[in-house]
A protein has these predicted regions:
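A short glycine-rich, Lys/Arg-flanked "PGG" loop and its adjoining helix->strand segment in the class I
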Residues: 273-287
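SAM-dependent Rossmann-like transferase core, predominantly class I methyltransferases
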Residues: 107-182, 186-196, 345-347
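Conserved beta-strand signature within the Rossmann-like core of class I S-adenosyl-L-methionine
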Residues: 288-295
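N-terminal auxiliary segments of SAM/dcSAM-dependent transferases
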Residues: 1-9, 15-26, 30-145
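Mobile active-site "lid"/loop adjacent to the S-adenosyl-L-methionine
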Residues: 212, 251-276
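Short alpha-helix
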Residues: 276-277, 302-318
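Class I S-adenosyl-L-methionine
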Residues: 310-358
């Protein structure tokens, strides 16, 4: 076969061989073949390909006899990982104009250019499941997303954490007057927290993110909202240079290893990012400055973090809680009784901690 560019979100190496399949392939045969390690290059009808993915997903084991929330959580992650690995072996080919060569296929060229730029070779091969995710993301990016308290819409990019959970956003609306404050936003994502703070009176925001896609997304959103003059964003590990009156961070809240790029918004192995944020916070604050940490307690409810762990970290880093405000987590899964983690998620709360350095 001709050389192709392999695109995968989970750093899987390019397949050594692709096996051509078509509409005659049954889901049972497909499952056997992908479990054998084959990558199946689909040619035929787009809707049939989507139906095959759905049928494969339904054939995967989801049963769990977990006895604790943590066992349920780990079983759910393993099942998701297995589903991802299995379904990612159904792949499709795009030509040098990012045309999907299946009958009844939608136009995917814009969605592909938004994520990858121009084609690098004659053919691009991508898991169909990932391409469907990119199409959905392109639609969100086109339509935009309304956020409570924000004037204007957020247009999220593919691979950047979607601000569909409103609990942490609504906590920010509790903040007192921000007039004239210089703000750092660490791990900005779409930029949503920065824009809320600017619309509430902050004079400037310097935002950072470790992912280039988030930086591009936040920059474009600032432009759309007319906030480019007061908003700067750059790729950085944690803090921008200098000091700020207010440093805000909504870090990943589950201390487990991320499995792919998108996971990094939720999973923080051994709480490394959270610990480094708290350790570096005092030095990033101007005199009289405050840190704002927004964190869910799901890790405690799952047994991944002991009760009181966060307070110990504050003390270790020379920080004290000036005030805090909590709210019940509001997201689609909190009410889903079929979710194996329902017990934990229904009790989840998100807290905004206002932190100041302990007086020397």
């Amino acid at each position: 076969g001709a050389p192709f560019t392999w695109r995968s979100e989970s750093d899987e190496p390019s397949p050594a061989r692709l096996h051509a399949v078509n509409d005659r392939l049954s889901a049972d045969t497909a499952l056997k073949r992908v479990r054998n390690g084959e990558f199946l290059l689909y040619s035929g009808d787009f809707h049939n390909a989507k139906q095959l993915l759905g049928a494969l997903g339904r054939r995967l084991e989801r049963a769990s006899n977990a006895r604790t929330p943590l066992e349920a959580f780990r079983a759910e992650r393993r099942a998701r990982q297995l589903e991802h690995e299995t379904l990612s072996r159904i792949v499709v080919s795009l030509d040098r104009d990012y045309r999907l060569t299946l009958t009844r296929a939608p136009d995917v060229a814009l969605a592909c250019r938004q994520v990858w730029g121009e084609p690098e070779t004659e053919f691009t091969v991508v898991p169909l499941k990932q391409l469907l995710g990119m199409l959905g993301a392109a639609e969100w990016r086109r339509k935009g997303l309304a956020v409570p308290g924000l004037t204007g819409l957020i247009h999220p990019h593919y691979g950047v954490y979607l601000p569909t959970r409103t609990d942490y956003i609504e906590l920010l609306l509790w903040l007192p007057e921000l007039k004239g404050q210089r703000v750092f936003d660490v791990g900005t994502g779409t930029g949503v927290l920065s824009f809320l703070l600017l619309q509430r009176g902050a004079s400037s925001v310097q935002a950072t993110d470790c992912d280039a896609r988030a930086v591009a997304c936040a920059r474009e959103n600032a432009e759309r909202l007319g906030l480019r003059k007061s908003f700067q964003v750059g790729e950085a590990d944690l803090f921008p240079e200098g000091k700020a009156d207010l440093v805000v961070c909504n870090p990943p809240w589950i201390p487990e290893p991320p499995k792919n790029r998108v996971d990094r918004a939720v999973f923080d192995q051994d709480s490394q990012l959270l610990k480094r944020f708290l350790e570096g916070l005092p030095a990033a604050l101007a005199p009289g400055g405050e840190g704002l940490l927004i964190l869910s307690d799901l890790a405690v409810l799952l047994g991944l973090r002991p009760q009181g762990w966060l307070q110990e970290q504050f003390t270790r880093c020379g920080l004290t809680v000036k005030w805090s405000k909590s709210t019940a987590a509001r997201h689609s899964k909190a009410k889903d009784t079929s979710d194996p983690l329902h017990m934990a998620r229904s009790r989840e709360t998100t807290t905004l901690y206002c932190l100041t350095p302990v007086a020397a």
